[in-house]
Swiss-Prot record:
GO terms for cellular component: plasma membrane. Could be involved in insertion of integral membrane proteins into the membrane. It comes from Neisseria gonorrhoeae (strain ATCC 700825 / FA 1090). Belongs to the UPF0161 family. This is Putative membrane protein insertion efficiency factor. It comes from the Bacteria. Pfam families: YidD.
Length: 73
């Protein structure tokens, strides 16, 4: 189950990276970008924990949040 959800999430993230992201200006304040962070988190921790980490990261990515290098733990 976790494997299938991971593949589904990775597919959705890749769709965003290749089809939607090029149409909007870059805004991510971190490296790696939030979408790349999500890919790495899902690959490393699986669908549930990876998605939780990605959501927390996206919630921190705003003008008043942090910035800089923030790798997947």
């Amino acid at each position: 189950m976790n494997f299938l959800l991971s593949k589904l999430l990775l597919g959705l993230i890749r769709f965003y990276q290749y089809c939607i992201s090029p149409l909007i200006p870059p805004r991510c304040r971190y490296t790696p970008t939030c979408s790349q962070y999500a890919v790495e988190a899902v690959k490393k921790y699986g669908a549930f924990k990876g998605l939780r980490l990605a959501i927390k990261r996206i919630a921190r990515c705003h003008p008043f949040g942090g910035h800089g290098h923030d790798p997947v733990p």
